[in-house]
Structures are given as C-alpha cells and as structure tokens.
Amino acid sequence: MEGTKNMSTKTNKRDLSPKQREDLLKALKSRFEKNMSRHKGLDWTKVQARLEANPEKLWSLNEMERTGGEPDVVGQDKKTGEFIFVDCSEQTPSGRVSLCYDRAALDSRKEHKPKGSAVEMAAAMGIEMLTEEQYFELQKLGEFDTKRSSWIATPPEIRKLGGALYCDRRYGRVFVGHNGAESYYSGRGFRGSLRV
C-alpha cells in the first residue's frame, strides 16, 4: 500500500506546475496576438484549448521557450487540425548553441567536445528540427538568423558522407550551407517545430 502511495505522489518530470503553465500560456498568447501576420485567420481560444488538452506538448513548448526559441503558431494542418508551432526568435535560440549535429558527430570528436548535439537536444525536448522547406517557409514570415545560423534536418545521404546542413539569412536572402556534422559554433543552434 505504501509503495502505491509513493508512486501516486510522484510527479512526472514532464509536468509543468500550475504557475509554469499559466506563465507559458500568457507568454504564448501575448506573442500570438502581437504577431497575427504569422497565423492569419487562426483563433487563440482554439489554440489554447488544444494546448490544455495536451499537457505533454505544453512541456515541450516550455522547453522551447526556456531555451530562447520564442515559439509561435505559424499554421494549421488542414487534415488533422493540429496547430504548428515554430521557434520564432529573431536569432537562433541562445540556449541551444555550441552543439554539433548529432550523437555520431559528437562521438567522433576526440577532444574539445561540444556540450551536446542538436538532434539529441531536439528529441529530449520532444520537438522536430526544421527541415530546409520549413526553414524557408519561416523566413517568409520575417527576417530570422541575420547574425547567427541554425542547423536543419539533414538528408541521410548527406549525413552518411559526414556532412550536415544549416541555414541563415544574409544580404537579403536565405542560404543553405554545409559543414562537417562534428563542427560546432557559438553562433549556431537549431530551430524546432511542434504540432499540437
């Protein structure tokens, strides 16, 4: 009986406290209302209802917020009704920089290892790294990564050869670049997306 009691009082580490939940919803609502051009025709009350019905998604959004991503709604999937959140910080999220691309890249470094990898951090946060297509779509909503850059999901055929892709905006246009996946920079992080 006592073991059952202890189990029931344990909280899932992916649960937010009521205060965290309230603060996050307030920040998300404020950002949503200030940036209506990112999600024309969408209604915050419907977004909030979805969020409240999916507490594990709130935890992931809180991780996006905590690491500097400033997540916001950028669309809605017409088939599933899911709202699509993306990191909309002006520069790549500051809490996600100095990461190599993935675990294989991290393991390949003999010395001067970075603190982690973008792919693993995204998975731990419960989000997906942006694809090249998603990154270009985001750039239609504003000017992002004008001073920094963001790793993007890299096709397996490029990754197999040791490379990884990143994107940024310079000189008024968006670029896709490549580096060895084991490289890391203080000015490069990654942007994520989450469907709710």
Regions found by a protein language model. Give the residues of each.
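A binding-site-centric feature that preferentially detects glycan-recognition modules on secreted/surface proteins
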Residues: 2-128, 132-196
